[in-house]
Design a protein with these regions (language model features):
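Class I SAM-binding transferase module
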Residues: 1-67, 71-169
Length: 169
């Protein structure tokens, strides 16, 4: 593959992060273009929307945790389905934009965006009723979210009645 030097310099600049393992991965999710591509994937987005809307009874008056919330689209779906409150956890810089998106949708009192890595955060509630996450990616597990989802499940999900969406792949 041939690339010109200017493009190469820009690419290197865009991908230069400190030496921590997760920085390249999460840094790439700070750019809006990757979220735009996911939102444009109507099959994926509508599948999540329908899954939440078709299970409104499961979401009504429940505390929901959205891991890797990105733009907040799943959090918005959950809030509109009747969730009592949604905690949207996002490590990448897109978290700042998602707060604005949530505010523009009039859901800032129903959705709280928490910027940080799931494993490093302490939720303001002892447990949640539902965990939602787009943890499936390219080649099923490429997005590396499964570890964070399992951590949250073990630490925060109501052991008796808690649910996860999706719960299988």
């Amino acid at each position: 593959m041939l690339i010109d030097n200017e493009f190469k310099k820009q690419l290197i600049t865009d991908l230069t992060y400190n030496d921590q393992k997760h920085d390249y991965y999460f840094g790439s999710y700070s750019h809006f273009y990757i979220h735009e591509e996911m939102l444009k994937d109507q099959v994926r987005t509508n599948a999540y929307r329908r899954a939440i809307e078709n299970n409104r009874d499961d979401f009504k008056d429940k505390i929901v945790l959205d891991i890797g919330s990105g733009t907040g689209i799943l959090s918005i779906f959950a809030a509109r389905a009747g969730a009592k409150h949604v905690y949207a956890v996002e490590f990448a810089e897109i978290a700042f934009f998602s707060r604005e998106i949530i505010k523009k949708n009039g859901l800032e009192n129903k959705i709280t965006v928490l910027k940080g890595k799931m494993e490093d955060l302490v939720l303001p509630v002892p447990q949640v009723d539902i965990i939602i996450s787009e943890w499936m990616g390219y080649f099923l597990l490429y997005e590396s979210m499964l570890d964070s989802v399992l951590y949250a499940r073990d630490k925060y999900l109501n052991k008796e009645t808690g649910k996860m969406l999706p719960d299988r792949a």
